[in-house]
Curated annotation (Swiss-Prot):
InterPro entries reported in the protein's UniProt record: Mrp/NBP35_ATP-bd, NUBP2/Cfd1_eukaryotes, P-loop_NTPase, YlxH/NBP35
Transmembrane parts of this sequence: none
This protein's UniProt keywords: 4Fe-4S, ATP-binding, Cytoplasm, Iron, Iron-sulfur, Metal-binding, Nucleotide-binding
Domain of life: Eukaryota
Biased composition regions of type Basic and acidic residues, renumbered to the chain: 268-281
Source species of the chain: Aspergillus terreus (strain NIH 2624 / FGSC A1156)
Subunit structure: Heterotetramer of 2 nbp35 and 2 cfd1 chains.
Protein name: Cytosolic Fe-S cluster assembly factor cfd1
Region described as Disordered: spans on this chain: 255-281
Length: 311
């Protein structure tokens, strides 16, 4: 059965490119994992897959099992005796199937549609509480194929999903930046959800301000509040704002997260030999908790869990 073992499916959508859908998808996944949920990420941005890079596994490859394709593991579930348990995190992306990470994907619509259908039917996810689907911008062939396939194999009705053992298409999280050019395109994505009868779970206003890496204070460099205003106007739940987080950027780029502290005597520091940086070998899930944006996504994750599981 397609998506066997998957309980809830959440789409991450935006009508505009460059608003941070992939980073929002990953941070939601990490936050849900830290809530003890088993999470999968399905990256259907076929021409620009970002998830392999964000999780630091660009050289990983998808393996085959009798049950189907096996997702690439990012984090294994843990049962901590001294702290809260964490769930597992796995992901699937076309980036894991490319011969070389620099290969361009130049496909027409029918081939994209076939690939998405294969992702939704041939992957052995196992027991997965939440499957987050990272989508490309706009409403293209990928979105149409995704909606058609999910509305056939899954259901938006919680009672029907529980009774029939089918996955539940819980809804879509819409991502925008504060600027009007982004919110105007997200309105089209809302219209897409209405026409396809996919519920909307809420709006996240990403890149809303800049979080200082030293103290965490948020400064509104550009405009702010556009996502909230759009959500209120369209009657959609507003989940919250996320500022630009330098620490998260350092995390996904493979660098060490800096604590933001500087030496009082710069001249003395310049004369000293630099000490080798200690390698932080903690799992990605644990390192993410050091990011300024984590408390915000922790709140988003709890809200989604309450809205979806409580429905």
């Amino acid at each position: 059965m397609p998506l066997d073992g998957v309980k809830n499916i959440v789409l991450v959508l935006s009508g505009k490119g460059g608003v941070g859908k992939s980073s929002v998808t990953l941070q939601l996944a990490l936050a849900l994992t830290l809530q003890g949920k088993s999470v999968g990420i399905l990256d259907i941005d076929l021409t620009g897959p970002s998830i392999p890079r964000l999780v630091g596994l660009e050289d990983a490859k998808i393996t085959q099992s009798p049950a189907g394709w096996v997702p690439v593991p990012v984090h294994s579930a843990t049962d901590n005796a001294t702290g809260p348990a964490t769930g597992s995190l796995r992901c699937i992306s076309l980036g894991f199937l490319l011969r070389d990470r620099g290969d361009a994907v130049i496909w027409r619509g029918p081939k994209k549609t076939a690939m998405i259908r294969q992702f939704l039917s041939d992957v052995s996810w196992g027991e997965t509480d939440y499957l987050l689907v990272d989508t490309p911008p706009g409403t293209s062939d990928e979105h149409i194929a995704l909606a058609e396939q999910l509305l056939t194999t899954a259901t938006t009705d919680a009672a029907a999903a529980a009774a029939g053992g089918r996955p539940r298409l819980a809804g879509a999280v819409l991502v925008t930046t504060p600027q009007a050019i982004a919110t105007s395109d997200v309105r089209k994505e809302v219209n897409f959800c209405v026409k396809t009868r996919i519920p909307t779970l809420g709006v996240i206003e990403n890149m809303s301000g800049y979080a200082c890496p030293c103290c965490g204070e948020v400064s509104n460099i550009f405009s702010s509040g556009g996502g909230r205003a759009m959500a209120q106007e369209m009657g959609i739940k507003f989940l919250g704002v996320v500022p630009v987080d330098v620490k998260f950027g350092e995390l996904v780029e493979g660098g060490k997260i800096q604590d933001g502290s500087d030496s009082e005597d710069e001249g003395e520091t310049a004369r000293q030999e630099p000490e080798p940086e200690a390698v932080d070998d903690r799992p990605l899930v644990e390192r993410y908790k050091d990011c300024w944006s984590y408390p915000r996504f922790e709140e988003f994750a709890r809200t989604l869990i309450a809205d979806i599981d409580g429905a």
